[in-house]
């Protein structure tokens, strides 16, 4: 198996949960970084959650974390998040079309 470095981007994330990434079948993925930028004129709050498919459980990485105007939040920095088959990473804002997200991953490890 080859290790594949990938970048996943989403723009204008709002009040509906967006699945940033779902680990493919028979693969394990390492999330290396997750940067979330506020693209609005006011402070927004963000939720980031992980769904552990094998345990049928969803847990919060951050809940209602404030991101001031013109700044970003590094949700995963200096650590790694392991996603197994069908595990998912999701993000939601408290404000419509307010966030851009960049996700860096290593897939097929």
Predicted regions and their residues:
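Hydrophobic beta-strand residues in large extracellular and virion-surface proteins
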Residues: 46-48, 89-91
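Short, acidic/polar linear motifs in exposed loop/turn regions
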Residues: 39-40, 95
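C-terminal interaction-tip segments
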Residues: 1-33, 92-109
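Long beta-sheet-rich domains in secretory-pathway and surface-associated proteins
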Residues: 35-37
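Beta-strand signatures of extracellular beta-sandwich domains
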Residues: 47-51, 102-104
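A generic structural signal for short beta-strands and their flanking turns/coil linkers
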Residues: 30-32, 42-44, 63, 85-87, ...
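Intrinsically disordered, low-complexity Pro/Gly/Ser/Thr-rich segments with frequent PxxP/GP/PP motifs
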Residues: 54-88
């Amino acid at each position: 198996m080859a290790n594949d470095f990938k970048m996943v981007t989403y723009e204008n994330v709002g009040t509906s949960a967006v699945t940033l990434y779902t680990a493919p079948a028979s693969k394990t993925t390492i999330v290396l970084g997750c940067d979330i930028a506020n693209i609005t004129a006011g402070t927004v709050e963000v939720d980031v959650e992980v769904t552990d498919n094998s345990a049928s459980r969803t847990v919060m990485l951050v809940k209602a974390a404030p991101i001031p105007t013109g700044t970003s939040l590094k949700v995963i920095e200096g650590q790694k998040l392991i996603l197994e088959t069908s595990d998912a990473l999701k993000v939601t804002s408290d404000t419509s079309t307010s966030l851009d997200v960049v996700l860096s991953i290593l897939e097929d490890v």
